Amino acid sequence: MNDYIRYPSEWKRNEEVFKIWDQQTGDNTEITVACAVQALNVYYLPDFIKWKLEQGFTKINMWPFGAGGINYHFVYHPPHLNVKVLPKWFKEECRKKYEEFYPWWEANWEKGIPSWHKGKVEYDTWRNA
């Protein structure tokens, strides 16, 4: 998806940069990644969040930022990329995918908690962030 939406950006290079930011910056560094949610990628956001959490990052979007997942900004212009223009059947497919994803995220919520908060953040605090 990245290679299509953010051309000429290449996803493999983005992965390398995420790892550099996470591993080669000072301990006082916090990195926030935000995604422009739009018609072309809204279906894939659960995949992106799961990928991010499974990387074991220690500085990228750690709780409470994006609940340990990612931050979002919705695209409103141009109008044809606004998620509101999607057909109802596709919105239902997105809803189904998100609802299937939520239990995984809830079971793995601690993956987004930074090490200095481990044991200090309870599930309910995370859930309500």
What are the functions of these language-model segments?
Residues M1-A129:
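Radical SAM enzyme [4Fe-4S]-AdoMet core and its adjacent flexible, acidic
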